Curated annotation (Swiss-Prot):
Name under which the protein is recorded: Shikimate dehydrogenase (NADP(+))
InterPro entries: Aminoacid_DH-like_N_sf, NAD(P)-bd_dom_sf, SDH_C, Shikimate_DH, Shikimate_DH-bd_N, Shikimate_DH_fam, Shikm_DH/Glu-tRNA_Rdtase
Binding, shikimate: S14, R15, S16, T61, N86, D101, Y220
NCBIfam families: aroE, PRK00258.1-2
Pathway participation: Metabolic intermediate biosynthesis; chorismate biosynthesis; chorismate from D-erythrose 4-phosphate and phosphoenolpyruvate: step 4/7
Family (UniProt): Belongs to the shikimate dehydrogenase family.
GO CC terms in record: cytosol
BP GO annotations: amino acid biosynthetic process; aromatic amino acid family biosynthetic process; chorismate biosynthetic process; shikimate metabolic process
Record key words, sorted: Amino-acid biosynthesis, Aromatic amino acid biosynthesis, NADP, Oxidoreductase
Organism (species): Leptothrix cholodnii (strain ATCC 51168 / LMG 8142 / SP-6)
Length: 277
């Protein structure tokens, strides 16, 4: 059996093993998926040891996505854009890294949420690793406008500058803004900050919404409730990040195995667990 794992610190509560085990059972792929708790300062050595023990690849979660980016021998174009890696494949001539977060987000919005991003006005809140990883796939989806807003606008500007050429090629009006001055009336609003963990209803004002806006928090379950409750109180349609989590996992599975698993049943099962908790 081929071995895969999620590498991070901590990974105790990760749902990745449950998700990938279901993907393996569904597709008939012969693999096992584990948790790899990596102590600070030991990322490369820990992953190398896992590879030496039969590992074929791993997902990478906080706080090691930048270290994975630096350690990879090759990177996919979307990983280069994100400047972060969440999926490593152990090839004979070195590690190949990908970033599946943004692709998972776009697929969740468009396929599971039923909302096409083409021609829409999109607001992305935050400029950390999660937001930066989402930027290129969001641009590729063809919105008319994409605004990245952040508490410190300089960080958002760095990501915007890195993606400026792609945005021009796709005809997307891409810009950076502060949380207090990010515009109004967006069709899709994505929260890539941890504001909900602090119990904050929203890092931006209600002017960003319009009737029927789709609002998504990258957090899922109880962690997303403050932001989503705020959105619903203003008439928006709200989604948490569970779909994104499962869709990015499916992208990683495909990157490793060349087989794309179905996500509906996995999503329904985990949603039922969350609702029952």
């Amino acid at each position: 059996m081929d071995r895969y794992a999620v590498a991070g610190y901590p990974v105790k509560h990760s749902r990745s093993p449950a998700i990938h085990s279901q993907f393996a059972a569904q597709t008939g792929e012969p693999l096992v998926y584990e948790k790899l708790e990596v102590l600070p300062g030991t990322f490369v050595a820990s992953v190398q040891a896992f590879q030496a023990a039969g590992g074929r690849g791993c997902n990478v979660t906080v706080p090691y996505k930048l270290e994975a980016f630096e350690a990879a021998a090759r990177r996919t174009p979307r990983a280069e854009m994100a400047q972060a890696i969440n999926t490593l494949r152990f090839d004979a001539d070195g590690w190949t890294g990908d970033n599946t977060d943004g692709a998972g987000l776009v697929r969740d919005i468009e396929v599971n949420g039923g909302v096409s991003l083409r021609g829409r006005r999109v607001l992305l809140i935050g400029a950390g690793g999660a937001a930066s990883g989402a930027l290129a796939p969001l641009i590729e989806a063809g919105p008319a406008e994409l605004v990245m807003c952040n508490r410190t606008v300089a960080r958002a500007q760095q990501s915007v500058q890195r993606h400026a050429e792609l945005a021009r090629a796709r005809g997307v009006a891409l810009s950076a803004a502060t949380l207090d001055d990010c515009g109004s009336g967006f069709d899709v609003i994505i929260n890539a900050t941890s504001s909900s963990l602090a119990g904050m209803p929203s890092p931006v004002g209600a002017q960003v919404l319009r009737p029927g806006s789709l609002v998504l928090d990258m957090m899922y379950g109880p962690a997303a409730k403050p932001f989503l409750a705020w959105a619903q109180s203003h008439g928006a349609t709200a989604r948490d990040g569970l779909g994104m989590l499962i869709e990015q996992a499916a992208e990683a599975f495909f990157f490793w195995r060349g087989v794309r698993p179905a996500t509906d049943g996995v999503m329904a099962g985990i949603r039922a667990e969350l609702d029952a908790a």
